[in-house]
Amino acid sequence: MSRFLSSKYEDLEPYTPGEQPKNMKKLIKLNTNENPYDPAPEVLLAINNEEIEKLRLYSDPEAAPLIEAAAGFYGVGRDMVMAGNGSDEVLAFLFMAFQQKSGRFYFPEISYSFYPVYCSVFGAEAVKVPLKEDFSIDPSDYYGVDGTIIITNPNAPTGI
């Protein structure tokens, strides 16, 4: 299959996800936003046959009910809410939408490890900005840069 790939991906470093422990009996895995617990009994009761039937169908591609609910909850307009199939898809859309002519993305040196991968995929330059000694971000490091700035809040994996 790789012989059909675009040459622009030849030097792309594959993404390596964080540690995926095998023995989960004594651990609660938190690094991939998975819930280690079963659904609450109230959730199980709320699922009825009609909803189970809907599980075989594609969801609304515009996510209208979800966007409406989130906009109402946060008191913002629908045009201020974006929904996607997980954070990686949303990030891909954001990289496409906000890539500047300079082609640079600035983000903390210690942050989400997929940012450099997206930079490679979209032909952008990844500029890693050092953190302060206490792992916090110095906003002045980003003043006047010629590209898109990514500030994750809270920053992963530092939590700051």
Region spans (language model):
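N-terminal "arm"/small-domain region of PLP-dependent enzymes with the aminotransferase-like
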Residues: 1-57, 144-145, 150
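Conserved core of the PLP fold type I
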Residues: 55-160
